[in-house]
Amino acid sequence: MTIVDTSVWIDFLQGSDHWTKTRLKEKLNDRESILYNDIILLEIIQGIRERSGREEINSMFNSLVLVPHKRSTTLLAAEIYQELQRKGLRIRSIVDCLIAATAIETGATVLHKDRDFEFIANYYPVITEKE
């Protein structure tokens, strides 16, 4: 199981040549379980101006696994954020903490291209896939 960070989805949808796009394509072709949460979908859809584009994304995500939002996930994300702040690490987005918490609770690997996940993985049991 893999949870895919928004930055990877954006590269995938825009046709970027980043290694994560290739990796996501492989996972989709292999029919691996791709997880997402509502925040990831929101971040992707917020940047799409055309209604048809939003409908296309919604349709694509219907074939993926939605992880329902739980209070425990929110509390873990807040703990991650606060603990790393105490250690002097600047996490740029609380959303990354929420994605990491979702991955920890589901046992999924995070496919990303964002340094925040590597900081988190140094202190919490989140598995990341990197180049």
Map each language-model feature to its residues.
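A general structural signal for well-ordered alpha-helical segments in protein cores
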Residues: 21, 41, 54-57, 74-78, ...
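A generic structural signal for short hydrophobic patches within well-formed alpha-helices
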Residues: 9-10, 41-44, 117
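Short beta-strand scaffold positions
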Residues: 4, 36, 68, 111-112
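Conserved glycosyltransferase catalytic-site signature
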Residues: 6, 38, 95-97
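Acidic, PIN/NYN-like endoribonuclease modules and their adjacent C-terminal/linker elements
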Residues: 1, 100, 104-131
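Active-site neighborhoods of divalent-metal-dependent phosphate/nucleic-acid chemistry enzymes
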Residues: 65-111
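Short, well-structured N-terminal submotif of metal-dependent ribonuclease cores
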Residues: 1-36, 46-59
